[in-house]
Structures are given as structure tokens and as C-alpha cells.
């Protein structure tokens, strides 16, 4: 017996706020728009094959992968070289200051960053984080612990 899925719009409505908060925490407000759209486009394509046991963890896993894609793409961007480089003022930071917490989270090693974001910004259990990252539950727990420990050290230094 197969369990029928609710309509995709209902799925989107149920999870949009969680995905949005997770992506803003992961990639920042500006990039979150694009990642959000890509997340739900991918989710819509894969929706008929989704296992209904934990749809929230499933869509946050997709969001996590889109955030990783965003960071990979930023690393590949061409850098202009030459004497004719334009002088551009840094845009104002539209997000409120947070004492550098999110900058420090973004500076964590990728496995720790993913575990911390999924666990705390995504509010997933360690088991769900493990599934999202494709690691054991113990590895997910360890990565979150090590990431938090590193953040505490940096915040108190």
C-alpha cells in the first residue's frame, strides 16, 4: 500500500518558513532567494519519489545541498586581473549585526558548518542531520559538537 502525498502547494506552505530561515542562516539573505527557489524547484521535481516519513528533513537536505552549490559557485567565479580594475565601494550590510556569529559559522569547516546549521538553524535531530549529510549519527553529533566548541572558543577569545 502506498501513502499518497499531499499536494505540493500544501507541502511548500508547510515547510517554506523553515527552509527560508535555514537558507538565510546558511548563505545570507541575498543569496537565500535564489537558493530557496532552486530548493523548491528540485523538491517539486523529486516530490513524487519522496518518502513520506520525514518531509521536513528531506527538504532541508535539499536546501543544504543548494547552499553548498552556492558556496562552490562563489569559489569558481572569475577574478578580474589587470591595472584597470574598477574601484567599487562595499555595499552596506543589510542584515543586522550579530557579533560575527554567522560569519564565524560560515568559516567553520564544511562538515561542521553543515552539522551546526542543520542542527540549530534547521532544528533537525542528530539522526536527521546524519541522514542529510550522509554520515553516521555519531559523526553528525561529533561535527556539531566540534563546530560549537570552535565557535565558543572564538567568541570568548
Q: How would you describe each model-predicted region?
A:
Residues 61-82, 94:
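Arg/Lys-rich amphipathic alpha helix in sigma70-family domain 2
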Residues 2, 6, 74, 83-106:
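Acidic, proline/glycine-rich intrinsically disordered inter-domain spacer in sigma factors
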Residues 64, 68, 133-157:
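DNA-recognition helix of helix-turn-helix
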Residues 115-119:
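A short pre-motif secondary-structure segment
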Residues 19, 23, 32-43, 62, ...:
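Short, small-hydrophobic-rich alpha-helical interface motif
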Residues 20, 40, 109, 113, ...:
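C-terminal flanking helix
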Residues 2, 29, 38-55, 73-75, ...:
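Sigma70-family region 2
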Residues 1-21, 113:
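A short, charge-rich alpha-helical start-of-domain segment used by transcription regulators
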Amino acid at each position: 500500500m502506498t501513502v499518497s502525498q499531499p499536494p505540493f502547494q500544501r507541502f511548500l506552505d508547510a515547510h517554506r518558513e523553515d527552509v527560508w530561515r535555514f537558507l538565510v542562516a546558511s548563505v545570507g539573505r541575498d543569496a537565500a532567494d535564489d537558493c530557496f527557489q532552486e530548493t523548491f524547484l528540485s523538491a517539486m521535481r523529486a516530490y513524487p519519489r519522496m518518502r513520506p516519513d520525514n518531509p521536513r528533513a528531506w527538504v532541508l537536505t535539499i536546501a543544504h545541498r543548494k547552499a553548498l552549490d552556492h558556496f562552490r559557485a562563489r569559489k569558481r567565479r572569475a577574478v578580474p586581473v589587470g591595472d584597470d580594475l574598477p574601484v567599487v565601494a562595499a555595499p552596506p550590510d543589510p542584515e543586522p549585526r550579530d557579533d560575527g556569529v554567522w560569519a564565524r559559522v560560515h568559516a567553520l569547516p564544511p562538515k561542521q558548518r553543515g552539522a551546526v546549521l542543520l542542527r540549530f538553524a534547521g532544528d533537525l535531530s542528530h539522526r536527521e542531520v546524519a541522514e542529510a549529510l550522509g554520515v553516521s549519527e555519531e559523526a553528525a553529533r561529533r561535527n556539531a559538537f566540534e563546530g560549537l566548541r570552535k565557535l565558543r572558543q572564538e567568541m570568548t577569545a
